[in-house]
Amino acid sequence: GGTLREIVHAVREASAAGKGTFVHLDLVRGLSSTDKETVEFVAEYVGADGIVTPKSHLIKEAKRIGLYGILHLFVLDSLALVNGLKMLDSIQPDGIEIMPGTLNKVIKRFAEASDKIPIIASGLIQTTAEAADSLQAGATALSVSAPELWSCTFDDLIA
């Protein structure tokens, strides 16, 4: 997360390094995380490749204007799992960010239910072993805050 200014700087820096950039709308101070105008702002002024949000209407708006829309899900119980699988069918996100990312059983269920939608494991992934476990469960990408994992490649994690 960060301020709007920090996010713009981080997106520019990451883009210049050839990285894909996604803005998690709930984590940016200075932007509404509920309005479609925020998605338009991210596309036009921030320059990110996509957004991350738990809000289905914002994912639909992102896709409409050419951004990737990543569905952010907290899967804390069986009901959240069932509802998340229903959302997968109804909004067709470009990816799914599952939290916590160490829930390999949940990652596997989503990976089996969505063979074409990338699964992003996120939250509580702090070691290379946890990162590798998430990938082996079916995650196709990771979103991590641990700096020691930022330079890891898939080859480093899957042997």
Task: Annotate each predicted stretch with a short phrase.
Residues 57-58, 148:
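Alpha-helix capping/helix-boundary segments
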